[in-house]
Amino acid sequence: MSDKKYVVYYHEKVNEYFYDYYPRFNMNEQYSKPVLYSDDFELIERAKNELNERLQEQSY
């Protein structure tokens, strides 16, 4: 585990999930919706990738 905190968030305008360091994440961004907070980078990266795969599957 890392000392850094991460957030996975959904960006409605571009219809995609992203991750960022929690301190840089702007909670007031109109189109960004947080979905997961963690200090486990591997979990954050895996969650973002799997959520984006599901979005692609739903769009077909």
Indicate residue ranges for each PLM-predicted region.
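Short aromatic-glycine-(Arg/Gly/Cys) micro-motifs in beta-strand/loop hairpins
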Residues: D3-K33
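Short, Lys/Arg-enriched, disordered terminal segments
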Residues: M1-K4, Q58-Y60
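A short, charged, amphipathic alpha-helix used as a generic interaction element across diverse proteins
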Residues: R24-Y60
